[in-house]
């Protein structure tokens, strides 16, 4: 009986069709097809463009409203209100004003206490109170320095030097002088000198009675206004007391127009000495006397009356308080030195004085800057500048060699230990070899414990901060170093004088040349 024969035939897999389909080649990728189309298009003859233009004309109407809508949303409204910009300067100015007011209050309280303490009867010095008031008047109105005031006050009161008094006065006196000049502060019992001029132009005079109730409502002072007709009502200013203002070369004049006379105004500009214009302001008369006043006097009569009392006020320039803190030269001292060398009939114009002072100050500042640069180059180190990079470190190389020697020593010791341990395990080894191997194992275990304990203690006591080298922090991203005091020596000045051509033939160069180079023992 023969066994049936079977033939293995490949059947369908999961998801396949029962009848195998015809395999079709995959279509070419679109990029290849586009390339063929492009090549054919180059070979084709150009066609007329009337049809595409017609299509464009047909497609333009629906695009136009879309563009208009986009313009409608993108174009900002011309009438949109804009918010006020931020004013960080106003807050800083308010903080500075509050600090100045606080300094003024402290200084006034201190001066009042000083006057009260000096009023005590002293048989040895009966004029102590008057002398103290004179010192206070000088330091407030006559620009006496705080050092002179402190020294004279110690002599008058016969007291010891107070270390905190001079810094306090240097910090608070500028604010007090500014407030006194503006008329917002005063010290009881201390009157200004006769020639003192305030910022608002008024000069110290006898106290006036308070104005009536009808004049209580004050109006803000306006700028200079010119009255078109001298026969009109005289000018009025609500500020109490007669004022005398020294204005610059050309004041701003606002014409009042063809209307009636203004209740507030100033008389026409009057030519004064040195090209200045003197303007006189009068106190406001009562309302019932306005109709009975006579016409204003002509301008020529006022020039003769006001020329003498204002000569002292215009002789010197009034600088705002605090403007000369950073100045090397004070114009008042320069003016005094110039006038001493001139004849009594000569005068110094303000513009020339300011030009000389500014030129000399600029020259001195430039020389000081150059000398500071020379001193910096003299004392600078090679590690600090960013132009130098550390390319070799001898200490690190020595440390590396020491580490290599230590590793070789440890390797040699470990080999000896292994040989001893191997010999101790041999049955033929003596008792001394076994004891020596055990002792070495005990020492190794103790040394390992000590190393682990020391590492744990160092990790617990040390911080996480890593010490970086100085040259790693140099670069544009690092912060600027703190400004430090530069010590300029005579050697720096000698080098600058010899190199600068502006010192050729000057007295200082000849003096330093005859004296020879300076020797600094501290270097």
Swiss-Prot record:
Give the UniProt subcellular location, in the record's own words: Nucleus; Cytoplasm
- Locations of Low complexity compositional bias? 58-77, 214-236
Where are the annotated coiled coils located? none
Q: Which PROSITE patterns match?
A: TAFH
Species for this entry: Caenorhabditis elegans
Q: According to the record, what happens upon gene knockout? A: RNAi-mediated knockdown causes arrested development at 90-100 cells and inhibits differentiation. The two E cell daughters (E2 cells), which form the endoderm, divide abnormally early, immediately after the MS2 cells. Phosphorylation of the RNA Pol II large subunit C-terminal domain (CTD) is reduced severely in embryos. Abolishes expression of a range of genes, including let-858, rps-5, hsp16.2, pes-10, cki-2 and sur-5.
The name under which this protein is listed is: Transcription initiation factor TFIID subunit 4
**Compositionally biased spans, kind Pro residues:** 78-87, 204-213
- Enumerate the residue ranges of region (Disordered): 1-100, 185-241, 407-435
GO MF, one example: DNA binding
Tell me one GO biological process term: determination of adult lifespan
Q: Can you state the subunit structure given in the record?
A: Component of the TFIID basal transcription factor complex, composed of TATA-box-binding protein tbp-1, and a number of TBP-associated factors (TAFs). Interacts (via histone-fold domain) with oma-1 (via histone-fold domain). May also interact with oma-2. Interacts (via histone-fold domain) with taf-12 (via the histone-fold domain).
The family database entries (InterPro entries) matched by this protein are listed as: TAF4, TAF4_C, TAFH/NHR1_dom_sf, TAFH_NHR1
Every copy of the TAFH domain together lies at 101-199
Task: State which gene encodes it.
Answer: taf-4
Region Necessary and sufficient for interaction with oma-1: list its residue ranges.
333-382
Superkingdom, taxonomy of origin: Eukaryota
């Amino acid at each position: 009986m023969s066994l049936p024969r079977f033939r293995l035939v490949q059947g369908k897999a999961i998801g396949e069709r029962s009848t195998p389909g015809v395999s079709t080649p995959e279509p070419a990728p679109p990029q290849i097809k586009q390339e063929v189309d492009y090549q054919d298009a180059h070979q084709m003859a150009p066609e007329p463009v009337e049809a595409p233009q017609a299509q464009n004309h047909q497609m333009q109407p629906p695009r136009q409203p879309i563009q208009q809508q986009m313009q409608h949303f993108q174009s900002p409204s011309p009438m949109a209100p804009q918010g006020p910009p931020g004013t960080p300067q106003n807050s800083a100015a308010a903080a500075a004003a509050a600090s100045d007011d606080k300094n003024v209050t402290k200084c006034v309280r201190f001066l009042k206490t000083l006057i009260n303490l000096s009023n005590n009867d002293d048989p040895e010095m009966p004029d102590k109170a008057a002398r103290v008031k004179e010192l206070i008047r000088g330091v407030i109105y006559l620009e006496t320095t705080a050092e002179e005031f402190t020294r004279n006050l110690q002599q008058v009161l016969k007291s010891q030097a107070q270390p905190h008094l001079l810094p306090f006065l240097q910090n608070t006196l500028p604010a007090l002088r500014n407030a006194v000049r503006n008329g917002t502060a005063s010290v009881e019992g201390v009157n200004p000198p006769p020639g003192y001029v305030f910022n608002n132009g008024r000069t110290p005079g006898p106290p006036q009675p308070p104005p009536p109730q009808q004049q209580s409502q004050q109006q803000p002072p306006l700028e200079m206004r010119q009255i078109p007709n001298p026969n009109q009502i005289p000018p009025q200013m609500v500020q109490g007391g007669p004022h005398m203002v020294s204005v610059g070369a050309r004041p701003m004049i606002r014409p009042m127009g063809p209307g009636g006379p203004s209740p507030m105004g100033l008389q026409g500009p009057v030519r004064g000495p040195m090209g200045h214009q003197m303007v006189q302001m009068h106190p406001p008369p009562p309302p019932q006397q306005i109709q009975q006043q006579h016409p204003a006097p002509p301008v020529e009569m006022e020039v003769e009356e006001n020329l003498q009392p204002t000569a002292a006020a215009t002789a010197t320039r009034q600088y705002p308080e605090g403007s000369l803190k950073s100045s090397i030269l004070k114009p008042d001292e320069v003016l005094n030195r110039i006038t001493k060398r001139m004849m009594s009939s000569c005068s110094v114009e303000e513009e020339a004085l300011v030009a000389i002072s500014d030129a000399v100050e600029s020259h001195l500042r430039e020389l000081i800057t150059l000398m500071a640069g020379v001193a910096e180059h003299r004392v600078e180190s090679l590690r600090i500048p960013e132009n130098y990079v550390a390319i070799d470190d001898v200490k690190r190389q020595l440390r590396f060699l020491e580490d290599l020697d230590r590793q070789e020593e440890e390797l040699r010791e470990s080999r000896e230990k292994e040989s001893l341990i191997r010999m101790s395990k041999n049955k033929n080894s003596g008792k001394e070899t076994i004891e020596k191997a055990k002792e070495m194992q005990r020492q190794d275990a103790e040394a390992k414990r000590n190393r682990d304990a020391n590492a744990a203690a160092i990790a617990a006591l040390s911080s996480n901060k890593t010490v970086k080298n100085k040259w790693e922090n140099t670069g544009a991203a690092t912060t600027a170093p703190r400004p430090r005091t530069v010590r300029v020596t005579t050697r720096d000045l000698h080098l600058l004088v010899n190199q600068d051509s502006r010192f050729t033939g000057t007295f200082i160069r000849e003096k330093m040349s005859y004296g020879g180079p300076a020797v600094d023992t501290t270097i």
